[in-house]
């Protein structure tokens, strides 16, 4: 179990700290590659939707129906799934729209007063940190269940964290002229994912059993579906043409399907 815990934590940390990659990209380029971002974000959505509905949700249902009976376990699976959606939706609603990490800006759009830019960067970092808490727990729980499921999820979350890193670092860099400060705040916002995993695990450990574990696993599926539909797909559409986003989604589903088949 300790080996699984270590692996799950490392995977979660890698996903969260990819915000630092976004920060570095912001320093070396003056233009946002919208086509690449559109396809990449669509790809992330495809991976997360496919693995949630084809692998995580059925696995949660199997765990719960074995721990309970078929009817009760199936009902709890569905309730936990939509409970996960409700949780991330509430968190999303509590974040002001102007600071919401879903409202991603391109590098070219940041041109305001230094004080306002600094505040924007700091508030975005805080918002992303709050938003990344449940993502961290979702990645961690997936890693505990099966690393082969978690690795594609980590890649998908890492891809969608890159533009969030840009959203934090660009305004802070333009306000202060300090790459170190911009990178630090971007990096710290990503730490919320492994922190969310640690806090969530220690809170749940005293009550952990197959029913709780299965319910959390189903809620993880709900969280990832909501993130995909509410965040990744709209961002993919905003950055590029409609079909680029859809091609990205289909590619993500295909890669995820093949990777799961390889581990059968």
Swiss-Prot record:
It is a multi-pass membrane protein. The keyword Ion transport applies. It catalyses: Zn(2+)(in) = Zn(2+)(out). Fe(2+) binds at residues 132, 135, 161, 164, 193. It holds the Pfam family Zip. InterPro entries: ZIP, Zn_transptr_ZupT. The chain crosses the membrane at residues 8-28, 36-56, 75-95, 121-141, 148-168, 197-217, 219-239, 244-264. Keywords: Cell membrane, Ion transport, Iron, Membrane, Metal-binding, Transmembrane, Transmembrane helix, Transport, Zinc, Zinc transport. This is Zinc transporter ZupT. It comes from Streptococcus mutans serotype c (strain ATCC 700610 / UA159).
């Amino acid at each position: 179990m300790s080996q699984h815990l270590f692996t799950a934590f490392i995977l979660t940390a890698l996903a969260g700290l990819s915000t630092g990659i976004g920060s570095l990209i912001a320093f070396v380029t003056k233009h946002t590659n919208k086509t690449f971002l559109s396809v990449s974000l669509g790809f992330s959505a495809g991976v997360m939707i496919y693995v949630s509905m084809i692998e995580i949700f059925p696995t949660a249902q199997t765990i719960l129906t074995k721990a309970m009976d078929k009817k009760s376990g199936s009902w709890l699976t569905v309730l936990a799934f939509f409970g996960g959606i409700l949780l991330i939706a509430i968190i999303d609603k509590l974040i002001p729209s102007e600071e919401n990490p879903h409202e991603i800006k391109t590098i070219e759009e940041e041109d305001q007063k230094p004080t306002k830019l600094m505040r924007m960067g700091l508030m975005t970092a805080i918002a992303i940190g709050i938003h990344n808490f449940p993502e961290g727990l979702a990645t961690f729980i997936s890693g505990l269940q099966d690393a082969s499921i978690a690795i594609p999820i980590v890649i998908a979350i890492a891809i969608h964290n890159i533009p969030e890193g840009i959203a934090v670092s660009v305004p802070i860099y333009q306000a202060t002229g300090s790459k170190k400060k911009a990178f630090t705040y971007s990096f710290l916002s990503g730490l919320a994912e492994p922190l969310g995993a640690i806090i969530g695990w220690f809170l749940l450990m005293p009550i952990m059993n197959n029913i709780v574990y299965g319910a959390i696993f189903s809620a993880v599926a709900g969280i990832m579906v909501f993130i995909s539909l509410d965040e990744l797909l709209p961002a993919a559409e905003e950055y590029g043409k409609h079909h680029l986003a859809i091609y990205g989604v289909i590619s993500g589903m295909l890669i995820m399907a093949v990777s799961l088949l390889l581990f059968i």
